């Protein structure tokens, strides 16, 4: 998991290691200069679909920063089409066609970009002219344009991956995104071995010289029209958490119980084992 905050174009980017521009974030002159300064300072960027395009001027659309290694050609001619996961970006996924349910962008990789995964077109678009009783036509097997491009400290995804995940929840979109996050941020602040339903939050109390780790595992169910409810608390067992910190830990306790927590240092991480998480557990990690 990754700690994250929502930001806008007027906020200070300097304290972040990575910015994510999802699907439809246009860039004006001021934001372009700000993103350039951010990357000059070592910052990294993930963007998808039409995010990062300069606001349209005289019918010309182009990406704000050449260092991203992509050239915009227009709206993709096929919907849906298919992406073929390969290499580190496709780690854990079979190297076969995975359907991308929403129309993406057609791009080319420039000499500053490296194509990680290609898109394959369908046999035809499902319209009144070429009808299929299924949701879409199958893949033709023909590669047509890049699906994922690695640039300078950046990755670009040609499809609106966040919109697709919001509408359809395909597991491969989440896996591709997580793989790319691991490539951009190989040493996250927090790692854990729990399921995706486990929420992990890490806070710092500087005056008290301690970190506060929250582990929450409540699964809401959509059983009514207006409200999601938690019917039962489902416990998790043998949860392990790794916290990256340059501070020297003195000890840890469960809060409010006050019981000691065993900690171990491993390659710059504090390793914590929690036997059981029943809804919520809080751990205070003191440092010097």
Residue ranges and their predicted role:
Residues 5-9, 155, 161-165:
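Catalytic grooves of carbohydrate-active enzymes
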Residues 132-139, 161, 191-192, 206-232, ...:
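Long alpha-helical segments found as membrane-embedded helices
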Residues 55-61, 166-171, 225-232:
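Short, flexible/disordered intra-domain loops and linkers
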Residues 14-22, 29-30, 34-37, 141-150, ...:
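Carbohydrate-binding surface patches
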Residues 1-63, 126-128, 132-140, 255, ...:
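Helical hinge/lid and interdomain linker segments adjacent to catalytic or ligand-binding clefts
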Residues 25-103, 121, 178:
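A glycine-rich, often tryptophan-bearing local segment used as a flexible ligand/cofactor-contacting loop or short
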Residues 79-152, 165, 176-204, 224-226, ...:
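Catalytic beta-strand/loop cores that center a nucleophilic Ser/Cys/Thr
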Residues 46, 116, 155-157:
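Hydrophobic/aromatic beta-strand patches that form the interior of the parallel beta-sheet core
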């Amino acid at each position: 998991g990754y700690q994250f905050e929502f930001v806008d174009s007027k906020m200070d980017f300097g304290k972040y290691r990575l910015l994510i521009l999802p699907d439809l974030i246009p860039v004006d002159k001021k934001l372009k200069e700000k993103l350039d300064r951010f990357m000059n300072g070592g910052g990294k960027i993930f963007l998808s679909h039409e995010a990062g395009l300069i606001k349209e001027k005289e019918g010309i659309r182009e990406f704000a920063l050449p260092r991203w290694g992509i050239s915009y050609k227009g709206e993709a001619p096929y919907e849906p089409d298919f992406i073929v996961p390969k290499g580190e970006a496709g780690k854990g996924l079979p190297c076969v066609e995975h359907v991308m349910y929403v129309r993406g962008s057609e791009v080319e990789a420039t000499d500053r970009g490296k194509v990680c995964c290609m898109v394959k077109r369908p046999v035809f678009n499902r319209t009144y002219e070429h009808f299929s009783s299924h949701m879409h036509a199958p893949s033709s097997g023909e590669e047509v344009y890049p699906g994922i491009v690695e640039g300078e400290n950046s990755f670009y995804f040609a499809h609106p991956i966040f919109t697709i995940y919001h509408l359809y929840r395909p597991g491969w979109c989440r896996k591709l995104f997580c793989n790319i996050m691991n490539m951009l941020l190989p040493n996250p602040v927090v790692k854990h071995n729990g399921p995706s339903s486990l929420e992990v939050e890490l806070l710092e109390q500087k005056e008290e010289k301690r970190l506060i780790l929250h582990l929450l595992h409540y699964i809401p169910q959509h059983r009514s029209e207006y409200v999601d409810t938690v019917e039962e608390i489902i416990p998790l067992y043998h949860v392990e958490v790794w916290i990256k910190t340059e501070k020297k830990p003195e000890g840890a306790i469960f809060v409010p119980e006050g019981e000691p927590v065993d900690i171990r240092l491993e390659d710059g991480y504090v390793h914590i084992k929690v036997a059981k998480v029943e809804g919520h557990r809080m751990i205070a990690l003191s440092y010097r």
